[in-house]
């Protein structure tokens, strides 16, 4: 998985320490577990407007997290598809 705004990384990813998405693999069959440097899972919404505990609808669903009603950051703005 590449770095993106959902993980708090610069887009496009500059590489090196500027990119905070890291992957830890524990075997090829185990798949890939991706986290940000701050400990958040990539794909979740780290923006300051916060999260809702339960997705309020399919449009706001983002993996295991969801964007709050007041969210308008880049991660949430693309959640309308």
Swiss-Prot record:
This is EC protein I/II. It holds the Pfam family Metallothio_PEC. Belongs to the metallothionein superfamily. Type 15 family. GO terms for molecular function: zinc ion binding. The keyword Acyltransferase does not apply. The keyword Protein biosynthesis does not apply. Induction: By abscisic acid (ABA). Keywords: Metal-binding, Metal-thiolate cluster, Zinc. InterPro entries: Metallthion_15. Binds 5 molecules of zinc. May have a role in Zn(2+) homeostasis during embryogenesis.
